[in-house]
Design a protein with these regions (language model features):
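Short, flexible/disordered intra-domain loops and linkers
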Residues: 68-78, 127, 279-288, 359-364
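Active-site acidic catalytic loop and adjacent metal/ATP-binding pocket
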Residues: 37-54, 58-60, 214-264
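Activation segment
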Residues: 65, 118, 247, 255-257, ...
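ATP/Mg2+ or Mg2+-diphosphate-binding catalytic cores
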Residues: 321-369
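ATP-dependent phospho-/nucleotidyl transfer catalytic cores
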Residues: 72, 123-142, 148-232, 243
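Conserved short submotifs of the Hanks-type protein kinase catalytic core
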Residues: 108-120
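Active-site activation/catalytic loop segments of kinase-like enzymes and analogous catalytic loops
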Residues: 85, 261-313, 339-356
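Conserved NTP-binding catalytic cores of kinases and kinase-like/nucleotidyltransferase enzymes
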Residues: 1-109, 244
Length: 369
């Protein structure tokens, strides 16, 4: 009988014993094991890094009953199972581009995954204005492979519908539908964080702009009704581990079937936030790299998507002349739209980005926002 046969929220002491029990294939040196909470560990879950004196290590991630960002948010603890299974599928579609998952535990709502502490969290690195020349190539490959290969263009339609059923979390979709695709435009639940000097601008340009509301409503309903491909679901620079020679995408708990452009738009928006931060310090070299990376990410996505489509398409009607171009035009349109909603929600919504909030000069922050 194990004390981990019933759910409870672990602390750093519990997690060492838990790791020994659940990750037994790793030859741990028990006497030298330690655990800490890493500095960057997201808004929802509880994350621990466990290691020993012989070079073995693992990340343990547990879903709590409440989200870390707000006790009012109580998404299902099943999100840990969801993330683990999505990561394993993404590893099949884009090998080596996500952390390896050692196990997931549906009782403790926890998983063990590859320790990527030899990588930087990309947002942290870009706050230091570090540059990563291969990022555009890596992230475009990841998006093309995970999005296209999980779509009806390639998959057997019955198999794809099974994945739609399997990878749906009403609680997490509800967070996206409210925090990203509604509240930044009306503050309906009084959770927005608006920078005081920008209140008049936000009221005029976001809260009172009915034409904008119409376009966001279209994007929201596309997100809710178009199960186009399996998304990472929260593909920002805080969900990317990076080194000069490699990129790994993590935090896939918001993964669901929705429009491809939601993922691609998130990447572009978060690069723009990095550009804003660089602009605030007049770092021309960094800003130039970010702009080049945005262009290369889009261009490489277009190029690779077209090539992979031709190689992998199985649906006969998707081979009809002109269909590929029509289909891809929709992805690019959605990319632009969802880049906009990400820029809005990360500026005035519940979860602001440090790229902007750490700009100390008021005029420069106003300009960035």
């Amino acid at each position: 009988m194990s004390r981990f046969d019933h759910y409870f929220q672990m602390n750093v002491d519990d997690v060492i014993e838990y790791t020994l029990e659940k990750a037994g294939e790793i030859p741990w040196d028990r006497d030298s094991m330690e655990a800490v909470v890493p500095p960057s560990h997201g808004n929802l879950n509880y994350v621990y890094r466990v290691w020993d004196g012989k070079g073995h290590s693992i990340y343990i991630k547990q879903a709590g009953t409440e989200a870390r960002i707000s006790k009012d948010m109580k998404p299902s603890r099943d999100r840990n199972r969801l993330e683990s299974e999505i990561l394993m599928l993404e590893d099949r579609f884009a090998p080596g581009m996500v952390p390896h998952v050692y196990f997931f535990d549906t009782v403790m709502c926890a998983c063990g995954m590859e320790d990527c502490s030899d990588y930087a969290v990309m947002r942290d690195a870009m706050l230091r204005h570090e540059t990563f020349p291969r990022f555009a190539d890596d992230v475009s490959t990841f998006m093309v492979n995970t999005l296209l290969l999980s779509s009806d263009i390639v998959m057997d339609h019955k198999d794809k519908k099974e994945l739609v059923r399997k990878f749906i979390s009403p609680d997490l979709c509800d967070i996206t539908e409210k925090l990203v695709l509604m509240e930044p435009y009306n503050d309906l639940n009084k959770r927005n964080n608006v920078y005081g000097p920008n209140e008049d601008f936000v009221k005029r340009e976001l809260y009172d702009d009915q034409a904008l509301h119409l376009e966001v409503a279209k994007l929201k309903f596309r997100f809710m009704t178009d199960a186009q491909a399996l998304l990472q679901g929260d593909l920002h620079t805080g969900s990317i581990f990076i080194r000069q020679d490699a990129t790994k995408i993590f935090d896939s708990e918001f993964g669901t079937y929705a429009p491809m452009g939601y993922d691609t738009g998130n990447v572009i928006a978060n690069l723009i936030f990095a550009y804003d931060n660089g602009l605030s310090t007049d770092d021309g070299m960094f800003c130039g790299w970010v702009l080049k990376t945005i262009e290369e990410t889009v261009d490489l996505f277009i190029e690779k998507f077209g090539k992979k489509y031709d190689e992998a398409v199985t649906e006969p009607m998707a081979k009809v002349k002109g269909f590929k171009e029509w289909y891809f035009d929709g992805i690019l349109r959605d990319t632009a739209g969802y880049a906009g909603t990400e820029l809005h929600r990360r500026t005035v919504g519940m979860a602001n980005v440090v790229d902007v909030t750490t700009i100390k000069d008021e005029k420069k922050r106003l300009l960035a926002e």
